[in-house]
């Protein structure tokens, strides 16, 4: 029996494309959005989207944007469900004040692993009520090898405190900030030592000034309330030349019309 040579061809639609796995982003920017009953300021998906737009505008290296939230509706960047741990914990300095103890779990290596953040990768946590004014690469490079960097200031009763509005850490390197926290005892220990606030009180108490930090004068990380409020400025229409990030860690927020009218530079940067 004679057989003819038969040539088979694979139709284009049946061809298999092999995709190479994408490398992890070297840094993950994290923001937080959840509803806290009784707190004065509601945070929205728009605030998250503006935050993400500012990061994209002022950080051009590879990165990942992540919002940890109890309500992802309307958020354009990647989201992750907020855990229930410490969801009923209140700020020991006052129930009307923000309570951010829930954020401490981000220091757990189990959580960063679940977030697909590799051990040693950088995580930069930011509050939503900030305005990024220029390139922030310097802030990240300055302490690139450190396990933890915070927004550093001088406390009323202690020489060094860290504000929870901004902090950067390497995943898996500061597990103790979560592992050693006990809500029944830790907040009272921090307050007894005159470190106030919720998560920032614990961070300041536990670190005791041993970690480096960004400052207003050296790094341009400023407080709108303390450094830039119109009443304190010769010209409310201009930013200091060294301003990189303005934190609205107080009652005034950058999306409020009155605040924008008093400081018109806000809308130049706080936008989609």
Predicted feature locations:
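N-terminal anchoring/stem segment of glycosyltransferases
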Residues: 3-92, 114, 171, 271
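Extracellular/periplasmic catalytic domains that process cell-envelope and extracellular macromolecules
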Residues: 22-23, 159-161, 237-241
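Short, solvent-exposed loop/turn segments at secondary-structure junctions
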Residues: 34-37, 71-74, 84-88, 130-132, ...
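Short, flexible/disordered intra-domain loops and linkers
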Residues: 36-46, 92-97, 190-194, 258-260
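Catalytic core and acceptor-binding pocket of nucleotide-sugar-dependent glycosyltransferases
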Residues: 171, 175-272
């Amino acid at each position: 029996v004679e057989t003819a040579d038969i040539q088979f061809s694979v139709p284009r639609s049946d061809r298999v494309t092999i995709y190479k796995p994408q490398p992890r982003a070297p840094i993950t920017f994290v923001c937080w959005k959840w509803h806290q009953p009784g707190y004065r300021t509601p945070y929205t998906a728009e605030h998250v989207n503006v935050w993400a737009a500012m990061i994209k505008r002022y950080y051009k290296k590879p990165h990942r944007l992540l919002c940890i939230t109890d309500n992802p509706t309307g958020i354009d960047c990647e989201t992750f469900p907020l855990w229930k741990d410490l969801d009923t914990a209140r700020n020991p300095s006052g129930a009307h004040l923000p309570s951010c103890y829930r954020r401490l779990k981000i220091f757990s290596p189990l959580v960063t692993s679940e977030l697909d953040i590799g051990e040693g990768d950088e995580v930069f946590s930011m509050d939503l009520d900030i305005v990024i004014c220029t390139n922030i690469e310097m802030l990240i490079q300055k302490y690139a090898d450190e396990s933890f960097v915070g927004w550093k200031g001088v406390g009323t009763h202690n020489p060094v405190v860290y504000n929870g509005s901004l902090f950067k850490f390497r995943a898996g390197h500061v597990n103790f900030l979560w592992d050693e926290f006990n809500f029944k005892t830790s907040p009272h220990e921090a307050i007894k030592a005159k470190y106030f606030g919720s998560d920032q009180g614990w961070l300041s108490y536990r670190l005791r000034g041993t970690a480096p930090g960004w400052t207003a004068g050296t790094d341009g990380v400023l407080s709108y309330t303390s450094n830039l409020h119109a009443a304190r400025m010769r010209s409310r229409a201009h930013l200091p030349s060294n301003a990189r990030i303005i934190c609205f860690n107080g009652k005034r927020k950058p999306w409020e019309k009155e605040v924008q009218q008093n400081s018109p530079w806000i809308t130049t940067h706080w936008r989609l």
